[in-house]
From Swiss-Prot:
This is ATP synthase epsilon chain. The keyword Nuclease does not apply. GO terms for cellular component: plasma membrane; proton-transporting ATP synthase complex. Produces ATP from ADP in the presence of a proton gradient across the membrane. It comes from the Bacteria. Belongs to the ATPase epsilon chain family. The gene is atpC. Keywords: ATP synthesis, Cell membrane, CF(1), Hydrogen ion transport, Ion transport, Membrane, Transport. It is found in: Cell membrane. CDD domains: F1-ATPase_delta. NCBIfam families: ATP_synt_epsi, PRK00571.2-5, PRK13442.1.
Length: 122
């Protein structure tokens, strides 16, 4: 089966790197699915979105991302997020509390919604 190299990087750290058969991400142009051999593209990730990676040899990886970019070549996908949280590391109750308490903080709301969306997709 064809595969591609994928890197998921946030400003603070590299979250995941390896070979995958599918990447899907939410961009400002809509949700995009990328398989090996995809046409080159550069996309802007939405605030409070998710990225899903299907590794060659493992369970699907899901992360909540808050802004950033997605760069695709025929053999490589690089996801550069302003911030990101792996779904398994997200505190669901804390994210729900942010939604309940921060009705005026749009950035905090977007991050919390993205975190909950990532947990649902994982």
């Amino acid at each position: 089966m064809a595969e591609m190299t994928v890197e998921l990087v946030a400003v603070e750290q590299r979250l995941w790197s390896g070979s995958a058969t599918l990447v899907s991400a939410q961009t400002t142009e809509g949700e995009i699915g990328i398989m090996p051999g995809h046409e080159p593209v550069l996309g802007q990730l939405i605030e409070g979105g998710t990225v899903s990676i299907t590794p060659v040899d493992g369970e699907r990886i899901v992360a909540a991302v808050h802004g950033g970019f997605l760069s695709v070549t025929a053999t490589t996908v690089t996801i550069l997020a302003e911030s990101a949280d792996m779904a398994q590391d997200i505190d669901v109750e804390a994210a729900k509390a942010v939604l309940a308490e921060n009705s005026g903080d749009l950035e905090a709301i977007a991050v919390a919604k993205g975190q909950l969306r990532a947990v649902e997709r994982a």
